[in-house]
Amino acid sequence: MALRVAAFDLDGVLALPSIAGAFRRSEEALALPRDFLLGAYQTEFPEGPTEQLMKGKITFSQWVPLMDESYRKSSKACGANLPENFSISQIFSQAMAARSINRPMLQAAIALKKKGFTTCIVTNNWLDDGDKRDSLAQMMCELSQHFDFLIESCQVGMIKPEPQIYNFLLDTLKAKPNEVVFLDDFGSNLKPARDMGMVTILVHNTASALRELEKVTGTQFPEAPLPVPCNPNDVSHGYVTVKPGIRLHFVEMGSGPALCLCHGFPESWFSWRYQIPALAQAGFRVLAIDMKGYGDSSSPPEIEEYAMELLCKEMVTFLDKLGIPQAVFIGHDWAGVMVWNMALFYPERVRAVASLNTPFMPPDPDVSPMKVIRSIPVFNYQLYFQEPGVAEAELEKNMSRTFKSFFRASDETGFIAVHKATEIGGILVNTPEDPNLSKITTEEEIEFYIQQFKKTGFRGPLNWYRNTERNWKWSCKGLGRKILVPALMVTAEKDIVLRPEMSKNMEKWIPFLKRGHIEDCGHWTQIEKPTEVNQILIKWLQTEVQNPSVTSKI
């Protein structure tokens, strides 16, 4: 019978370095006999403090004094010199602080789940009421969203290597032993599983364990996997009414300083799918917004509803209704324009601002922006978008064709006619009726965009382009101002519309600007180079938001 269930231990498999390793290092550091700490910890079974802890009969704070006393008795019995101030809680605190998720192992579990495997964590764990309990909480919070089941000994009252917990695993997952592969870093925990008929893998080295897991499951794990994206069905959705009849939809994850992710055209909150979990795990309350006109947000037909002044006012109301005094704003494409304007017109509400691809360009009060657009060939598509109903008809006719034509990697054949849309009568005129799928998307992701745009059509999204003169007049009110909030500009080497050189004079208006640059990347930055985007954003956020300089920028 083929394998269809993958069960993973936590400590030493999904989390490294292991607590057992911490015991070993502490034995060496304290000049204690080998196995003095680890041996007593393990041989307290049965019915000792550790078994009671792992079965949830006592909590961590109750366990510590019992183990401290046990170690003191053991030290006298064997003549070991235990420090006077010794406490097992210190060793655990250090071990938990040092422990982090074993990313290659997690990615393997995710790959197996994508392939159709049921995945499960089976761990001897404890009820942590200690003062360092947040580290365990954070780890379990992140891991649990990627597995179908979580079996913790302290919650079910059974521990490895007792056979009962393996039977509980099979009953819970409705699986037969020969359908299960089980990974653990202790051979004693694997033996009962193997005796029952499960395939077992002893994890002493992640790389070799993964090679064995590939072999037994017939799955090739990617060498450089993408960040873990969020699933629309597994995230929290919210709505804020910003004025009568108009609401904004958002997806929320994490806790900490508020961070608003704002997408461009023709996209969705879903375009931030690779960033949402990573930023939440980095310590932020992430709110990925469906911009006005998109998805589950309201999509009024009137052009003036999409004027930049109104969009920014509604974003302030969005914060007000959620009780958020300040937020970090990160925008891409059209939303890049919006977040720069938020920093310019509502600096007191902007904790920091970042833009992907879209530079800050102050208006020229003497030159009409439409004249500028007409003078730049690559902006020709924006002229095509001006007449209501025309582009809508083209883009809505076959939305699979539309999104597969738009979402292309920088090294793939480009289809949309940004340079000559008005001349040839459309942006998709030379596009295949059934374009091949880009390597930066999946069929399921394209289908999600299609379903979102079936709700609203393209009228609202295109209206963002139809307020050029109105936006220009409003933005001229900010002439002479500088952006002094923490700011980041991320350029993409191969974006043919928002070219990196367009940002070269930004320091004149944003004197404390930080920069990031991504090579071999086109316009769809968040999905083409998600790892690089996440690294740049998190590094900047940690410096400018979580640990900001106290130096005044005024």
UniProtKB/Swiss-Prot annotation:
The modification N6-succinyllysine is found at residues 55, 176, 371, 420, 454, 504, 508, 553. Its cofactor is Mg(2+). The active site is at 333 (nucleophile), 465 (proton donor), 523 (proton acceptor). Residues 233-554 are annotated as: Epoxide hydrolase. The modification Phosphoserine is found at residue 368. Homodimer. Belongs to the AB hydrolase superfamily. Epoxide hydrolase family. This is Bifunctional epoxide hydrolase 2.
